[in-house]
């Protein structure tokens, strides 16, 4: 088993922190303090060492401390590749972010080579009633833990889709280049769709195998390409190429690509009630989301033999005692680094006894 964890975390001009340095090890870490003390800001800073825009999906200009033009986050990480120094620098005036590994620049999508990460925030509790884009991004973040190339595939797909839209919008008469772009999109789409389906199988198996205090969920993906793969309907890549060709005129008028894996939706059902999670109560939705996160943790550890870093923002809030006790036992048994925020330790004293406490 390979344990991934932060040895240290340094923030400079990050949100409400002028300077902050934390020393940590492979144990649970509880961040306590009043609302506004910066607990979630620390989780967000850690999440920047994973592909994407962090757990808040914030604009770069919002991250730097007010009145400062730059900010920096640095960590010494026990990573998949061994001991690694990672840093990310954000400059407000140029709206740029640079990520470095041992002082050499790397692409944001390369971060999955170093870490596995899972997070849960209160904002995610509305994911079942929000847009399909949010659910798709949630699924893709799960996929990153199983396939280190998935983030790069998504970036390439976005790039080629943008190029296709540009060619159609500007009425560039270059059918050969358009054909090449659509062929690349089709090949990448096939890989992305298969990665998503494979990951859903992993998580579903983990859900079915676990007996806990949370409702079981049925996971699926609603997308034309994924459905054809599941039905084993011929040459998927050629099918995508054909559909992209057929929708050129329509997409030229729309100014966007109307067909593709960027239209798929991640669907979640309450298994016992056989209804979509979006129709469940808010309490049930939070419980279902936690069930998926627990399955993701178990599946990631079991299949990759690599432990993820967990970022859990106010996870114990509004849970009944039985579920809170179950989670504390689950986390204590993991032997991994997890970061938990809480305004106080009421109700989680047993968990706190085995954790590193950081009061802000």
From Swiss-Prot:
InterPro entries, per the entry: DNA-binding_RecF, DNA-binding_RecF_CS, P-loop_NTPase, RecF/RecN/SMC_N, RecF_2
Compartment annotation: Cytoplasm
Key words of the record: ATP-binding, Cytoplasm, DNA damage, DNA repair, DNA replication, DNA-binding, Nucleotide-binding, SOS response
Residues engaged in binding ATP: 33-40
GO molecular function: ATP binding; single-stranded DNA binding
GO CC list: cytoplasm
GO biological process, one term: SOS response
Presence of the UniProt keyword Nucleotide-binding in the record: yes
Pfam families in alphabetical order: SMC_N
Family statement drawn from the similarity comment of this UniProt entry: Belongs to the RecF family.
Function: The RecF protein is involved in DNA metabolism; it is required for DNA replication and normal SOS inducibility. RecF binds preferentially to single-stranded, linear DNA. It also seems to bind ATP.
UniProt-listed HAMAP family: RecF
Protein name per the record: DNA replication and repair protein RecF
Organism, scientific name: Rickettsia prowazekii (strain Madrid E)
Species classification: Bacteria, Pseudomonadati, Pseudomonadota, Alphaproteobacteria, Rickettsiales
């Amino acid at each position: 088993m390979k344990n991934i964890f932060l040895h240290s975390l340094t923030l400079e001009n990050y949100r409400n922190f002028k300077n902050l340095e934390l020393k940590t090890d492979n144990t649970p870490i509880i961040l306590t303090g009043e609302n506004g003390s910066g607990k979630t800001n620390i989780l967000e800073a850690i999440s920047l060492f994973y592909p994407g825009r962090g757990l808040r999906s914030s604009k770069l200009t919002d991250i730097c401390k007010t009145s400062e033009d730059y900010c920096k986050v640095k960590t010494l990480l026990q990573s998949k590749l061994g001991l690694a120094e990672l840093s990310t620098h954000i400059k407000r005036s140029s709206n740029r972010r640079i990520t470095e590994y041992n002082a050499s620049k790397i692409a944001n999508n390369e971060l999955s080579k170093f870490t596995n990460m899972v997070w849960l925030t209160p904002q995610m509790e509305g994911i079942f009633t929000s847009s399909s884009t949010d659910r798709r991004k949630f699924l893709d973040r799960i996929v990153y833990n199983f396939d280190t190339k998935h983030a790069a595939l998504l970036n390439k797909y976005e790039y080629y889709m943008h190029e296709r839209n540009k060619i159609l919008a500007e009425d560039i008469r270059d059918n050969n280049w358009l054909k090449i772009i659509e062929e690349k999109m089709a090949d990448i789409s096939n890989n992305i769709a298969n990665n998503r389906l494979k990951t859903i199988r992993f998580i579903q198996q983990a859900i079915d195998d676990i007996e806990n205090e949370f409702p079981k969920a049925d996971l699926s993906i609603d997308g034309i390409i994924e459905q054809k793969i599941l039905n084993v309907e011929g040459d998927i890549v050629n099918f995508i190429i054909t559909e992209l060709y057929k929708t050129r005129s329509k997409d030229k008028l729309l100014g966007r690509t109307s067909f593709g894996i960027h239209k798929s939706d991640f669907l979640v059902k309450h298994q016992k009630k056989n209804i979509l999670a979006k129709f469940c109560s808010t309490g049930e939705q939070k419980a279902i989301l936690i069930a998926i996160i627990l399955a993701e943790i178990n599946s990631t550890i079991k299949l990759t033999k690599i432990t993820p870093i967990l970022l859990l923002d106010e996870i114990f809030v509004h849970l009944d005692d039985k579920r809170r006790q179950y989670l504390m036992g689950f986390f204590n048994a993991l032997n991994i680094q997890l970061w938990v925020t809480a305004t106080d330790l009421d109700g989680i004293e047993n968990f706190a006894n085995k954790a590193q406490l950081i009061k802000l």
